[in-house]
């Protein structure tokens, strides 16, 4: 089995790790950073920028720079969460044909899995550059509270990126794996994971290589992006109060505010006060306007108080579902960059009654855990058993629009559960199975995962036919449902891809497009390399012509000059093959010139080598009294 990489596909940043010699190693990207911004930009030239390159140009290209796409993955356009994002995003979020939330850039529509796949391709390339071999197998992490359609969409993103996703693993569980791999004692831990866009808390029991998740809870729309937005709103409100101009209407200014807000938030984790300076942020009839203000840690904490308060509920629910109290928890592990905020750490301490453990790197621990899980699946890591859970209950709609649960939340996965139902009317020929996920009593209040029909039921009074519905959740947390008429043995099943997901055909089309784009990238790189080599060849040839042109025939010199002119003309175009051909022709024409350069160099070397020897001989014969070699030798002898 080939190498398995572990990828933490984050809302704000992503990270990749691999097992090396039995130890997980976080891999630095081409820019030398161990995390990569989960950002994609589409330049005017058609070039696609990923990661740090995309982030650097975001201020000047806000409408075509995509970030926090993970918050849209597997979501319908009409949901409240998406509407919130539409109100604050500089890029365009549109409704797809299947009612999903997609994005539109430069007139082209993209699904969130497609955009996420571009980030995954960058992580794949980072790993391949480090390992020196092709990589196809991966373990990808998702927030523990992701529902089925979000998990399926993440798996689709992996497939589009050219990865074989061996396992989808929950982020807090991955962090627990990284924390507890070398721990020998039994303990109960809470993993508090507050990232760029999502919040999860999981309660686990660790012991003898077994990692058992007891419960999980969270909010898939609460994270650093929301804290950033609070800061942006505060800065914009203060500026409006001061200057009477609302910066929210200017996308470029808004992007600058976002960067400044994020920077201020990070600085206030270690400082009590920070300055925000944004010169030339906007202009009016009186001239340009500059934004200068101070932000204190206390002010930041007060404007984010509402978000901090939201962190407590999921923690209390997770403890209750696990049948534990806060005092039963031995360690609290902090995961995600947002846990560096002092107010977040204080909140964790208040909830669990103990100082959180800060022994793991919150930005890298999830990718490390994913790499360890990859090692487990590959057989490199022995004696580790991971027992994860499904975050939400699963069931079907029954008479009266009620949700009848077949699998309760926090059930260990993989798992399988069956229940027998019957018809609601006499002589009913078919039953419609409406599959749902959620905790509410009424079907309409829960998330629809899919619908399918079991037909061909023989005529019978209501309540007589026996329909067995079976739910099967695999180790990725992805649901398969089947319905069987026990009387006839007729069966119908679906693998849930969510009512608003990508079809198999769409995924395959996107895979082909991603491969085509990779081929385009390769062509662009080859063209740049050919141009660089050609530029260098022209420079060296012209330099040599200036110095040694008089050492070759006029006809040879003319051939070379014609070759240089032809190569310069080829450089005006964008055909790598033409440039290579013209470069080869110039190199052929330059052979005589190269010989002249070589001969001159050799001649200079020979003269340089013989000169001291000649002087020494002459000196020895004619200028004996002036030679100091003997004196020098005597001095050396004295020193000895």
UniProtKB/Swiss-Prot annotation:
Keywords: ATP-binding, Chaperone, Nucleotide-binding, Phosphoprotein, Stress response. Signal peptide: none annotated. One of its GO terms (molecular function) is ATP binding. Transmembrane segments: none annotated. The keyword ATP-binding applies. Residues 600-640 are annotated as: Disordered. Induction: By stress conditions e.g. heat shock. InterPro entries: ATPase_NBD, Chaperone_DnaK, Heat_shock_70_CS, HSP70_C_sf, HSP70_peptide-bd_sf, Hsp_70_fam. The keyword Transferase does not apply. Residues 630-640 have a biased composition (Acidic residues). The modification Phosphothreonine is found at residue 198. Acts as a chaperone. PANTHER family: HEAT SHOCK PROTEIN 70KDA. Belongs to the heat shock protein 70 family. NCBIfam families: PRK00290.1, PRK05183.1, prok_dnaK. This is Chaperone protein DnaK.
């Amino acid at each position: 089995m080939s190498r398995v990489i572990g990828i933490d596909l984050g809302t704000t940043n992503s990270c990749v790790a691999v097992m090396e010699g039995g130890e997980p190693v976080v891999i630095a990207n081409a820019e030398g950073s161990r995390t990569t911004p989960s950002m994609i930009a589409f330049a005017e030239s058609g070039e696609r920028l990923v990661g740090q390159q995309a982030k650097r140009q975001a201020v000047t290209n806000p409408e075509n720079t995509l970030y926090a796409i993970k918050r849209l993955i597997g979501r319908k356009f009409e949901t409240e969460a998406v509407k919130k994002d539409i109100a604050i995003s500089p890029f365009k979020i549109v409704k797809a044909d299947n009612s999903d939330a997609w994005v539109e850039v430069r007139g082209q529509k993209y699904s969130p899995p497609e955009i996420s796949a571009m980030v995954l391709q960058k992580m794949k390339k980072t790993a391949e550059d480090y390992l020196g071999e092709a990589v196809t197998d991966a373990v990808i992490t998702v927030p523990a509270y992701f529902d089925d359609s979000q998990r399926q969409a993440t798996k689709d993103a992996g497939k589009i990126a050219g990865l074989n996703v061996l396992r989808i693993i929950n982020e807090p569980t991955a962090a627990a794996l990284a924390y507890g791999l070398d721990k020998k004692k039994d303990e109960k831990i809470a993993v508090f994971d507050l990232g760029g866009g999502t919040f999860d808390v999981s309660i686990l029991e660790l012991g003898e290589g077994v990692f058992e998740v007891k419960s999980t809870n969270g909010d898939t729309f609460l994270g650093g992006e929301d804290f950033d937005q609070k800061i942006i709103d505060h800065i914009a409100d203060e500026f409006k109060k001061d200057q009477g101009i609302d910066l929210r209407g200017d996308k470029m200014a808004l992007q600058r505010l976002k960067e400044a807000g994020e920077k201020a938030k990070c600085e206030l984790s270690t400082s009590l006060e920070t300055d925000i300076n944004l010169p030339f942020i906007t202009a009016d009839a009186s001239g340009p306007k500059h934004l200068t203000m101070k932000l204190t840690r206390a002010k930041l904490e007060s404007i984010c108080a509402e978000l901090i308060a939201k962190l407590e509920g999921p923690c209390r629910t997770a403890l209750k579902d696990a049948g534990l109290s806060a005092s039963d928890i031995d360690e609290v592990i902090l995961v995600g960059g947002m846990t560096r905020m002092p107010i977040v750490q204080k909140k964790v301490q208040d909830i669990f009654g103990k100082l959180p453990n800060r022994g793991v790197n919150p930005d890298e621990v999830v990718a490390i855990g994913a790499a360890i899980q990859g090692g487990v699946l590959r057989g490199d890591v022995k004696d580790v058993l991971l027992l994860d859970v499904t975050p939400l209950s699963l069931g079907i709609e029954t008479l009266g629009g009620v949700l009848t649960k077949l699998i309760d939340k926090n059930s260990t996965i993989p798992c399988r559960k069956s229940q027998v139902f019957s018809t609601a009317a006499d002589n009913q020929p078919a039953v419609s199975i409406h599959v749902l996920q959620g905790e509410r009593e009424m079907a309409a209040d829960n998330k629809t995962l899919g619908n399918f029909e079991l037909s061909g039921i023989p005529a019978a009074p209501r309540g007589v036919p026996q329909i067995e519905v079976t739910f099967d959740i695999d180790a990725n947390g992805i649901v398969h449902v089947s319905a069987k008429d026990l009387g006839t043995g007729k069966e119908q099943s679906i693998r849930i891809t969510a009512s608003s997901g990508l079809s198999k055909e769409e995924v395959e089309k996107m895979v082909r497009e991603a491969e085509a784009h990779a081929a385009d990238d390769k062509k662009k790189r080859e063209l740049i390399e050919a141009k660089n080599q050609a530029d260098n060849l022209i420079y060296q040839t012209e330099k040599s012509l200036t110095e040694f042109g008089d050492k070759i025939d006029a006809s040879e010199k003319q051939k070379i000059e014609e070759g240089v002119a032809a190569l310069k003309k080829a450089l005006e175009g964008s055909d790598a093959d033409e440039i290579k051909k013209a470069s080869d022709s110039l190199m052929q024409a330059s052979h005589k010139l190269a010989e002249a350069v070589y001969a001159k160099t050799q001649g200079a070397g020979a003269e340089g080598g013989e000169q001291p020897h000649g002087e020494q001989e002459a000196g020895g014969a004619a200028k004996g009294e002036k030679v100091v070699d003997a004196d020098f030798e005597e001095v050396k002898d004295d020193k000895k």
